[in-house]
Amino acid sequence: MHEGKNAKYVVDTPKKNAKYPSYRVKNDPKVVKPIVQVDADTVPGAEFYAETKWILPGDKKEIKLCESHTHNFGEMLGFFGYNYDDIQDLGAEIEITIDNEKHKVTKSFTAFVPPGVQHGPVIIRNIVRPIFHVSSGPTKVYK
């Protein structure tokens, strides 16, 4: 636990009792590992949410993170490979659908999804190295 008047702004543990909408797929915690989440539940006064997690190689050939859905806010999604020799190498293939258009990506990337635009599913295939995932949007709590 951090001390001081601003310690409440430092988050270093996963969000306890996190609740997610039904379109978020529950994954094996040995493979998809939450790091931290900033939102109005974890940081008083937060005006946005940001969620981070590691996605690790495992037994499954495919991991689905979410089904198709929309938000009333824009969302940034980022996926970054863990290859020191080539930081652009994702170490997997990610299929992300945005507005019914499928994109297959094998490089580290970010995507912005405008408010009201359908996105998902997000499917990760052939993971050979850890992937750092971040998502963020201008909403106090992810819904």
Give residue spans per PLM region:
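A short hydrophobic beta-strand segment most commonly corresponding to one strand
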Residues: 126-143
